[in-house]
A protein has these predicted regions:
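A glycine-rich helix N-cap at a beta->alpha junction
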Residues: 153-168
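N-terminal glycine-rich, Lys/His-bearing helix-loop that initiates the first secondary-structure elements
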Residues: 1-83
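Conserved N-terminal alpha-helix of the aminotransferase class I/II PLP-enzyme fold
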Residues: 4, 59, 64-120, 145, ...
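Short acidic loop-to-helix transition motifs that present clustered carboxylates
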Residues: 119-122, 166-172
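Short helix-loop-beta connector
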Residues: 106-110, 130-133, 182
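Active-site phosphate-binding strand-loop segment of PLP-dependent enzymes
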Residues: 168-189
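Conserved PLP-anchoring active-site segment centered on the Schiff-base-forming lysine
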Residues: 128-146, 165
Length: 189
């Protein structure tokens, strides 16, 4: 039944969503600095705490086994539609969700992602946009771990790279792009 809800399938009403964010008052759009004070946080979801508490946990409870199974099927792609809710802080957590919501507001972006390190952000970028046979064109030198990721790790999967000096002119960068030939340039980094 395609119209079944989460509650129909698991017998449990899904986690309540936070209250809608206030983005204007009296027809006047609030500035990001004002929105950052409370955006993405609903005190009723946190025992009435006025400010967002720090959630020092790595795992979250499911109401029953069926809800847990359905959630993991959504995360792993075994079921279409993804998964909502919290399960394990390596996927998401209340603090991370609020931070990402607020970064999106601050940057006027549709969404934002927070990572535990710069290298995890860089690796995610490359893995999301590069396929075997692609070329990454980048300025050089790079941080050693980034160069290692590009040359040694992505190189094993058929991703190539070309670099240009950090002070290169637009013409020099275009020359490096021509060197890439007919291959697909996945990104200029």
């Amino acid at each position: 039944m395609p119209d079944e809800t989460e509650a129909d399938m698991t017998g449990i009403t899904p986690r309540r969503r936070p209250k809608p964010n206030v983005e204007e008052i009296g027809g006047r759009k609030l500035k990001p600095s004002t929105l950052m004070m409370g955006h993405g946080f609903d005190p009723s979801l946190s025992e009435g705490s006025l400010k967002q508490p720090i959630f020092a946990t790595s795992t979250f409870v499911f109401p029953n086994a069926a809800a847990g199974k359905r959630h993991f099927e959504g995360i792993t792609g075994k079921r279409e539609g993804g998964a909502e809710g919290l399960v394990y802080s390596r996927f998401n957590g209340p603090n991370q969700e609020i931070l990402e919501d607020r970064l999106g507001v601050w940057e006027d972006a549709e969404e934002a992602l927070a990572f535990s390190s710069g290298m995890s952000a860089i690796a995610t970028l490359f893995l999301a946009f590069c396929s075997p046979g692609d070329t990454i064109i980048h300025s050089g030198p790079l941080y050693a771990a980034t160069e290692t990721l590009i040359a040694r790790i992505l190189g094993k999967f058929g991703v190539k790279f070309l670099d240009f000096p950090a002070d290169a002119s637009p013409e020099e960068i275009e020359a490096v792009m021509r060197k890439a030939g007919d291959g697909r340039v996945a990104m200029i980094y």
